């Protein structure tokens, strides 16, 4: 775990999906809870539960996988960190990119909290582009 909690969450989920793990454990922070809530609402993960161990809180995520698949495995989740500590990327609501023509989502940090691109366009507010998920 480094100092960039968003990158840690994205990397943990991406690695677990790549190796077909069904459960991921990430550190519980306000930002991670907001991002996980969006992933759960959009259907990218199945379940979330809180776990406490040695006075540290964790979120235990259950990933969504295709079961009984015989062919080669393709990742179901594609996550990409955009704005990072060394290079912040901001966008107004008109220039928020559309991922796969609206099939994917963009997670933004706005003055109203962390939200998806669709919510930001409806609210007509921009913000920092945290990551793409498709």
From Swiss-Prot:
This is Small ribosomal subunit protein uS8c. GO terms for cellular component: chloroplast; ribonucleoprotein complex; ribosome. The keyword Chloroplast applies. One of the primary rRNA binding proteins, it binds directly to 16S rRNA central domain where it helps coordinate assembly of the platform of the 30S subunit. Keywords: Chloroplast, Plastid, Ribonucleoprotein, Ribosomal protein, RNA-binding, rRNA-binding. Gene3D superfamilies: 3.30.1370.30, 3.30.1490.10. It comes from the Eukaryota. GO terms for biological process: translation. Coiled coil: none annotated. Belongs to the universal ribosomal protein uS8 family. GO terms for molecular function: rRNA binding; structural constituent of ribosome. InterPro entries: Ribosomal_uS8, Ribosomal_uS8_CS, Ribosomal_uS8_sf. It is found in: Plastid, Chloroplast. PROSITE patterns: RIBOSOMAL_S8. Part of the 30S ribosomal subunit. Its main location: plastid.
């Amino acid at each position: 775990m480094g100092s960039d909690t968003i990158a840690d969450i994205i990397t943990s989920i991406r690695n677990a999906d790549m190796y077909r793990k069904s459960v991921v454990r990430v550190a519980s922070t306000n930002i991670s809870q907001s991002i996980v809530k969006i992933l759960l609402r959009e259907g990218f993960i199945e379940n979330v539960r809180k776990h406490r161990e040695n006075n540290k809180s964790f979120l235990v995520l259950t990933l969504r996988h295709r079961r009984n698949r015989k062919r080669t495995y393709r990742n179901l989740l594609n996550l990409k960190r955009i704005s990072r500590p060394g290079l912040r990327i901001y966008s107004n609501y008109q220039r928020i990119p559309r991922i796969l023509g609206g099939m994917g989502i963009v997670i933004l940090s706005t003055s109203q909290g962390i939200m998806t691109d669709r919510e930001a366009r409806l609210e007509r507010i921009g913000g920092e582009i945290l990551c793409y998920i498709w």
